[in-house]
């Protein structure tokens, strides 16, 4: 009689533990899947942001194609390693867009700067020039374009950070994904703590990059005022980077929570089984 009661009690305890363990596994697995989806979306957004040229956009009135000044500006913009003032003047005048790697302007399609008197948008084409590595790491001057005005260290390091930090962020996320894949293969959530930490660092890098870019643009416009009737705004590439940062933070929180709580619950369940 007593043996039957003990056996029934043991059976109930085992069944209860199995049910609780299954519920916990489902909860942690759900958090892990959601974190993976957020991580994937933020990676796509970050990669698209890095690879596109719409971090900042200028809107300017139509320029006269026959102007010798406009022709000269285009030729200087198209030159290798044009100075900062030269290419920014072109961006201001020709509806320019700027990315991390390239700068683009909208110019007449005819290379000889001749168009019919009735100009339409069909005669416009976008021309882009890539920033060379020398330009990416070149010093910025207190007076843009004037090499004798002294080096502006703040703008110099803001530019370098806005260029480097997105790549660091993307690299951290890829490394975190590799660790997460290993965790899946090992059927253990605990290694995902490292994945969560890497995503947290990636989010900080993305946030730092966005902050550096905003500060750099504001300082540039203090040095080079926009011409009359020209306006500027942050583009969709910049917005993708802004959205990517909170996604990285949310993924990080879910990864760390799932790994930490799963280990804690597993320890409690192990102690319960022993008891």
Feature roles, as predicted:
Residues 224, 232-266, 272-275:
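Long, compositionally biased interface segments
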